């Protein structure tokens, strides 16, 4: 399956493949990052992309799943965070020029979970 095809699968299909160890969370994340890199210059949908940390999280998920510690259907799935939620150490502008340099020192509760 091509990288583009992986990103076009439903989240439930991606989750099933990850759970069944037929798809690596790292492979899926790399596919998503490649798609962002290819299309975001045109779409401008992302303010900040944290590719390195996303890959780190995917590697951890892959190790956990390989060790039989699958935590549920969202485990190992890539996700984006709207720029209106505080993310510790990551530029969070709230879509405003006034907040153009805002880098929170804490995560929003929904991010912590």
Ranges and model annotations:
Residues 42, 50, 57, 90, ...:
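Generic hydrophobic, aliphatic-rich segments that mediate packing or membrane embedding
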Residues 22, 69-70, 90:
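Conserved SET/PR domain catalytic loop and adjacent active-site segment
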Residues 11, 73-110:
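Enzymes and membrane/adaptor proteins characterized by extended Gly/Ser/Thr/Asp/Glu-rich
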Residues 41, 62, 85:
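N-terminal Rossmann-like NAD(P)+-binding subdomain of aldehyde/semialdehyde dehydrogenases
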Residues 1-56:
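An N-terminal boundary/leader segment
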Residues 51-75, 81, 100, 104:
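Flexible, acidic active-site loops/lids enriched in D/E/S/T/G that coordinate Mg2+ and/or position polar
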Residues 5-6, 61, 67, 92:
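Hydrophobic alpha-helical segments, principally membrane-spanning helices and signal/leader peptides
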